Amino acid sequence: MAKAKFERIKPHVNVGTIGHVDHGKTTLTAAISAVLSKTYGGEVKNFAQIDNAPEERERGITINTSHIEYDTPIRHYAHVDCPGHADYVKNMITGAAQMDGAILVVAATDGPMPQTREHILLSRQVGVPFIIVFMNKCDMVDDEELLELVEMEVRELLSEYDFPGDDLPVIQGSALKALEGQPEWEAKILELAEALDTYIPEPARDIDKPFLLPIEDVFSISGRGTVVTGRVERGIVRVSDEVEIVGVRPTTKTTCTGVEMFRKLLDEGRAGENCGVLLRGTKRDDVERGQVLAKPGSINPHTTFESEVYVLSKEEGGRHTPFFKGYRPQFFFRTTDVTGTIELPEGVEMVMPGDNIKMVVTLIYPIAMDDGLRFAIREGGRTVGAGVVAKIIA
């Protein structure tokens, strides 16, 4: 009898390169692809293929991003690389490419530069949890002390933004020399891959997180009660589970008495599935679109938060003119628009289309949120910006 083919599904981790322009992010991406495919198998992407990043649209925002994949013995990685600084800003704020960890590329010949700092700050704001440093172009620096100095500088900069600068891995290498096949530098790429494997923990799968379903629609079924529908964002809901209805109004508790999908009754609804959840003793008017159904105690409603925002340029269909403090647009969270006011950082009078900016937002009513929640800014149904909740205030 033929044996069934054994396929081990490796854990999947999302990473990306960040850092200052011309410090070697794309060359490093190509070097990782080349060295790992040579060592562990897989498809090679060369520099030109990665550099020619296709245009993508995420929430109406044009972003150029290159996606490559590679394997280590224990994991499968999806890696994003962006050609331009603006692409990084947009990518990180919209969450188009969410990263479980980032590889910060710093040229040893230059040390940290303005965009190095900006990418670290962005990583902190949008919740990139882990950073590994690759000091590039080390073949061009003969002085050991200089390399040590640059490493110290990078570690201090990371600590300044609350990353564990003293403890995180720093690998000194040369992406170009590794790409040219020089064994001593190829070894540095393998060292980087090992750091990815050991330093970035395996991310929790959506299905293992606490249950959350953004409510899209509410129906009442005579004799059975109220059904809310939507796509389960994370976790699992089972019949007879206690759930909370969070956001917009005071939080209430109820019980799931049924789950249905495509008119069939199920025992549970899981992350990624569109389903209807029947709620015990809940009236049709007690629930509305914009609220979420969640595991009790797992998420709270908030109105005020600090955010990192990218304002669409005129070419992207955004505003043609700047906006000022006191601007009152709609903030679109998950399934609904909420009006809010903004507070700009000290010394900032106006925000131009194409800018990215830190702002404090106060909504007119509370929405269920955690740090890292993405939102769109809209005016009359047109998207004019994208943002992420960096820190909840109230």
Curated annotation (Swiss-Prot):
User: Organism's domain of life?
Assistant: Bacteria
Residue ranges of the region described as G1: 19-26
Q: Which UniProt keywords apply?
A: Cytoplasm, Elongation factor, GTP-binding, Hydrolase, Magnesium, Metal-binding, Nucleotide-binding, Protein biosynthesis
Descriptive protein name: Elongation factor Tu 2
Give the organism's phylogenetic lineage.
Answer: Bacteria, Pseudomonadati, Pseudomonadota, Gammaproteobacteria, Alteromonadales
- What are the tr-type G domain coordinates in residue numbering? 10-204
Give the organism the record lists: Shewanella frigidimarina (strain NCIMB 400)
Name the residues that bind Mg(2+).
Answer: 26
Q: Where is this region: G2?
A: 60-64
Q: Where is this region: G5?
A: 174-176
Q: Where is this region: G4?
A: 136-139
Which SUPFAM superfamilies does the entry link to?
EF-Tu/eEF-1alpha/eIF2-gamma C-terminal domain, P-loop containing nucleoside triphosphate hydrolases, Translation proteins
The EC code for this enzyme is 3.6.5.3
Known partners and oligomeric status: Monomer.
Function noted in UniProt: GTP hydrolase that promotes the GTP-dependent binding of aminoacyl-tRNA to the A-site of ribosomes during protein biosynthesis.
**Residue ranges crossing the lipid bilayer per the database entry:** none
One Pfam match, by short name? Answer: GTP_EFTU
Q: Identify the main location.
A: cytoplasm
* InterPro entries xrefs: EF-Tu_GTP-bd (IPR041709), EF-Tu_GTPase (IPR050055), EFTu-like_2 (IPR004161), EFTU_2 (IPR033720), G_TR_CS (IPR031157), P-loop_NTPase (IPR027417), Small_GTP-bd (IPR005225), T_Tr_GTP-bd_dom (IPR000795)
Gene from which this protein is expressed: tuf2
What subcellular locations does the record give? Cytoplasm
